[in-house]
C-alpha cells in the first residue's frame, strides 16, 4: 500500500499557497498548534480523518500532526477534494488517499486505506468512516465493505475496536446517524459530537454555510439573486443561514419549507413565508435543500416547477433531491456549465441541477471561509486531545462547555475584541437564591 495516493503531485506548490492563505485566517487553530507542538498531547495516536480535503482541513491536519499524531486523511465526499491541497499534504508526510471525482469504489477504497493504519481516533464528517467501521464490527458484508477490504486487507474486527479510543463527528447529518446507532444499541465506541458545540453550529452551520452555499450557486450559474423567488427546504441552522443571505442578496421572496412546527413558526417570525413544497414548487426560481433527509424535493415537486428552475443541495448527502428519479424520466440531459446540468422533462420544461445534487458549496465553490472553519476545526483538534486524555464510556457526547467557551475566548482575542467581566458583587448576586425583589 502506498503512503499516499493523490491525483497530481505536481500541484503541491499551489496547494502550499492555498494552505498559507488559510493559515493567515485561522489564528485560533494556529494558537492551538503552538501549544500542541510543545505538549504533544496526541503522541502515539493514529488519527483517521474522513473530512472534506480542503485548505482549511489541511490546517487542521497540520495541527494534529504537530500534536504528535500520525494522520491519515481521506475525503468525506467524492467531489469535494482540492487536489492541490491533497498533493501538498502528501509531500509533508500526511498519508493522503484523495482526489476530486472519485467513484464509489475509490471512495470506499480510501476508507480501507485509512483502516489499514489501525487508527486509535476517528474524525468524521457525515459518519461514513464510523458507519463503515461499525458495519465491520457487526459483521455486515455489503458491496461497500468489499471495496474497503480491497485496500484494508483482512480486518480483525476485535483488534480494530480494541485500538479505537473514540471518534469525533463534524456534521448534523453525521450526529443523527450516530445517535440512531446509539439508540439501536449498536454503538461500539464513544463519539464526541463536535457539531453540538455552540462555537460550531452557531457559526459554521449558519454563517459558513449561508455564505458558501450562495457562493456555490452563483459560481455555478452566474445568476442574479435579486428579484428571484428562493425556496429553502429546512430551517435548522443551515437553512437559517441560507435564508439570511438570500434576503441580503435581494431575493424577492424567501420561502421556507419545514416539517417542524416550532421551526416553521420561527421562520414566520423571522419574516419569511412558510408553505409546503407542493405549493412552493410552483413559484420558486431557486431551490436549496438543507434537511438532512431523503427526497425533500421529489420528482412530483420537480414536475410542478417553472421552466428554468435551479436546484441545489446544501445537505451532506446527495439524497435530498430525487436525482435518480430525474435521471430516469428526463428526455434529455446536457452539461451547459461546469457543475451545472440541464434536464428536459417530458412536459418540455427544463430544470438545472448544480453539482449532481451533492454539497453545492464544496462541489461548485471552495466550502466555508477559513475564518469560520477556524472555530469548527479548533473544536475538532481539542476534541481529539480530550479523547486522548480521557477514557470515555460508549456514548455520544457534547464537547465540554469549558472547551467550547475557550474556543470563543480565543477567537475574540485574535480579533482584538474585549468583553465585559462580572464584578464580585454580580457574581454573588447570581449565585444567591435569597436576593430578589
Curated annotation (Swiss-Prot):
Cofactors required: NAD(+)
Binding site for NAD(+): 171-173, 205, 234-239, 258, 293, 314-316, 361
GO MF annotation terms: adenosylhomocysteinase activity
InterPro entries: Adenosylhomocyst_ase-like_sf, Adenosylhomocysteinase-like, Ado_hCys_hydrolase_NAD-bd, NAD(P)-bd_dom_sf, S-Ado-L-homoCys_hydrolase_CS
Family: Belongs to the adenosylhomocysteinase family.
EC class of the enzyme, as a word: hydrolase
Pathway named in the protein's UniProt entry: Amino-acid biosynthesis; L-homocysteine biosynthesis; L-homocysteine from S-adenosyl-L-homocysteine: step 1/1
Residues forming coiled coils: none
Function field: May play a key role in the regulation of the intracellular concentration of adenosylhomocysteine.
Gene Ontology terms: cellular component: cytosol
Superkingdom assignment: Archaea
Enzyme Commission designation: 3.13.2.1
Keywords: Cytoplasm, Hydrolase, NAD, One-carbon metabolism
PANTHER family reported in the protein's UniProt record: ADENOSYLHOMOCYSTEINASE
Transmembrane residue ranges: none
Positions of substrate binding: 54, 125, 170, 200, 204
GO biological process, alphabetically ordered: L-homocysteine biosynthetic process; one-carbon metabolic process; S-adenosylmethionine cycle
Name by which UniProt lists this protein: Adenosylhomocysteinase
Cofactor note: Binds 1 NAD(+) per subunit.
Catalytic reaction annotation: S-adenosyl-L-homocysteine + H2O = L-homocysteine + adenosine
Subcellular location: Cytoplasm
Amino acid at each position: 500500500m502506498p503512503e499516499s495516493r493523490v491525483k497530481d503531485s505536481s500541484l503541491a506548490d499551489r496547494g502550499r499557497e492555498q494552505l498559507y492563505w488559510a493559515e493567515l485566517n485561522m489564528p485560533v487553530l494556529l494558537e492551538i498548534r503552538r501549544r500542541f507542538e510543545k505538549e504533544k498531547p496526541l503522541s502515539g495516536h493514529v488519527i483517521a480523518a474522513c473530512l472534506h480535503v480542503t485548505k482549511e482541513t489541511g490546517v487542521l491536519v497540520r495541527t494534529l500532526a504537530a500534536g504528535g499524531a500520525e494522520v491519515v486523511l481521506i475525503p468525506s465526499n467524492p467531489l469535494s477534494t482540492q487536489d492541490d491541497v491533497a498533493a501538498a499534504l502528501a509531500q509533508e508526510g500526511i498519508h493522503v488517499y484523495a482526489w476530486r471525482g472519485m467513484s464509489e469504489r475509490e471512495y470506499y477504497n480510501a476508507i480501507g486505506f485509512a483502516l489499514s493504519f489501525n487508527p486509535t481516533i476517528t474524525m468524521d464528517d457525515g459518519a461514513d468512516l464510523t458507519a463503515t467501521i461499525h458495519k465491520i464490527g457487526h459483521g455486515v458484508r455489503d458491496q461497500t465493505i468489499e471495496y474497503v477490504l480491497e485496500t484494508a486487507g483482512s480486518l480483525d474486527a476485535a483488534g480494530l475496536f480494541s485500538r479505537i479510543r473514540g471518534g469525533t463527528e463534524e456534521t448534523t447529518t453525521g450526529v443523527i446517524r450516530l445517535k440512531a446507532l446509539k439508540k439501536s444499541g449498536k454503538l461500539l465506541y464513544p463519539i464526541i459530537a463536535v457539531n453540538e458545540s455552540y462555537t460550531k453550529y452557531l457559526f459554521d452551520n449558519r454563517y459558513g454555510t449561508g455564505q458558501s452555499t450562495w457562493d456555490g450557486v452563483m459560481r455555478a450559474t452566474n445568476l442574479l439573486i435579486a428579484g428571484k423567488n428562493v425556496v429553502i427546504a429546512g430551517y435548522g441552522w443551515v437553512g437559517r443561514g441560507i435564508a439570511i443571505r438570500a434576503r441580503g442578496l435581494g431575493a424577492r421572496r424567501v420561502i421556507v419549507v419545514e416539517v417542524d412546527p416550532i421551526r416553521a413558526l420561527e421562520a414566520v417570525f423571522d419574516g419569511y413565508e412558510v408553505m409546503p413544497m407542493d405549493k412552493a414548487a410552483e413559484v420558486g426560481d431557486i431551490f436549496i435543500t438543507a434537511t438532512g433527509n431523503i427526497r425533500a424535493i421529489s420528482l412530483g415537486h420537480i414536475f410542478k416547477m417553472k421552466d428554468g428552475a435551479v436546484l441545489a443541495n446544501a445537505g451532506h448527502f446527495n439524497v435530498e433531491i430525487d436525482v435518480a428519479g430525474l435521471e430516469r424520466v428526463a428526455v434529455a440531459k446536457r452539461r451547459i456549465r461546469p457543475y451545472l446540468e440541464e434536464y428536459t422533462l417530458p412536459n418540455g420544461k427544463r430544470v438545472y441541477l448544480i453539482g449532481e445534487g451533492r454539497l453545492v458549496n464544496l462541489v461548485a465553490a471552495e466550502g466555508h471561509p477559513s475564518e469560520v472553519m477556524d472555530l469548527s476545526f479548533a473544536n475538532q483538534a481539542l476534541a481529539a486531545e480530550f479523547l486522548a486524555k480521557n477514557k470515555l464510556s460508549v456514548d455520544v457526547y457534547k464537547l465540554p462547555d469549558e472547551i467550547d467557551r475557550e474556543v470563543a475566548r480565543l477567537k475574540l482575542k485574535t480579533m482584538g475584541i474585549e468583553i465585559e467581566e462580572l464584578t464580585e458583587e454580580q457574581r454573588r448576586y447570581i449565585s444567591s437564591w435569597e436576593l430578589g425583589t
